[in-house]
């Protein structure tokens, strides 16, 4: 496979941007290679600057649930573009997307739009503290809530990719109020509440962990968190930046039947444009400025282009049979991967929910980040390189979830499974 042009562009980029990229995982450092440089995307496919085509299971890290450059999304964007790219003022599109989010997500009675998932999580932490009058927060090992200082504690994902326990430049004082527990360990959470009476503002988590690979909640875990937070006068926050509108129309909270107090969102609700949001009970959200004293603002928040792409994407997702199709397609893909590995005697453990999936190169089960780290990352790096040569683009990290889309066909899934079969057979 010829990647000469990608190599040239990335070589130049390293003199222009730190590591040659705008986000660390894109550098392919954890898979011991140089990144491919994309030229265009369409449907389930991505083409690099050398003309190679890939079946894409990264989907711009989650937003492309309808497939890249969906014609209806593009048409809607072109219409809005004629009216301007940014108003810096209220527009009716904000109302429309807000109504759709409120109708869909059980916990959300009011919503505030921002520009990224990181920004949403930063704001929601401030809101948790403002509403409760408490400073401490509990997060889980391997759960990633963006690159804000107070969340870069045992954060999985990009931090794990770099092999760092946390990040230099984050003062201890900044994270002193961030408490951590193993994911799926309810007793550890109860112990933290017992050790810090009337001091914990709330618990924030990815209800399905997509930034430590793909880890699902054990039966009773989410329900237990809901109970223990209520008992202690603390808030429960679901970070649904990744799972929102992806594992069901109403997100993980609809899927599992557990309603948090607050929710952060991003990715899908922007249809491929920069976006984030946080929302929850009206009683809590009324504290956000200008209604209340908790300040948060943004120059491009509620950008008309992002609102337009989000509205059209949610309209497409609301069509009958959408999530049944995604569930079946993703299950077929994962089952094929697991079967192919087992036929070649390669240890593997994996799971899928709707349009998300992940696998670990170990026996499993994987219930938390510590168990996830037993996955064979060197073997994953080799598989990643070989899959690229077969025309399949997987996330360039052993600790990232994979994504399917409505644009993926049975033929795409079959071709991907065949590529895995050939590679597993070759390396076994």
Curated annotation (Swiss-Prot):
Q: In which pathway does it act?
A: Porphyrin-containing compound metabolism; protoporphyrin-IX biosynthesis; 5-aminolevulinate from L-glutamyl-tRNA(Glu): step 2/2; Porphyrin-containing compound metabolism; chlorophyll biosynthesis
Q: Which cofactor does it need?
A: pyridoxal 5'-phosphate
Q: What class of enzyme is it?
A: isomerase
Question: PROSITE patterns this protein is in?
Answer: AA_TRANSFER_CLASS_3
Tell me its EC number(s), please: 5.4.3.8
Q: Which residues carry this modification: N6-(pyridoxal phosphate)lysine?
A: 267
Where is it chiefly localized? cytoplasm
**GO CC terms of this entry:** cytoplasm
As recorded in UniProt, coiled-coil segments are none
Q: Where in the cell is it found?
A: Cytoplasm
Show the Pfam families listed in the entry: Aminotran_3 (PF00202)
Q: Which UniProt keywords apply?
A: Chlorophyll biosynthesis, Cytoplasm, Isomerase, Porphyrin biosynthesis, Pyridoxal phosphate
* Catalyzed reactions per annotation: (S)-4-amino-5-oxopentanoate = 5-aminolevulinate
Classification via SUPFAM superfamilies: PLP-dependent transferases
**Annotated GO biological process:** chlorophyll biosynthetic process; protoporphyrinogen IX biosynthetic process
Which PANTHER family does the UniProt entry name for this protein?
A: GLUTAMATE-1-SEMIALDEHYDE 2,1-AMINOMUTASE (PTHR43713), GLUTAMATE-1-SEMIALDEHYDE 2,1-AMINOMUTASE 1, CHLOROPLASTIC-RELATED (PTHR43713:SF3)
**Family (UniProt):** Belongs to the class-III pyridoxal-phosphate-dependent aminotransferase family. HemL subfamily.
Name recorded for this polypeptide = Glutamate-1-semialdehyde 2,1-aminomutase
The species this protein belongs to is Prochlorococcus marinus (strain NATL1A)
Give the classification, highest ranks. Bacteria, Bacillati, Cyanobacteriota, Cyanophyceae, Synechococcales
- Tell me what gene encodes this: hemL
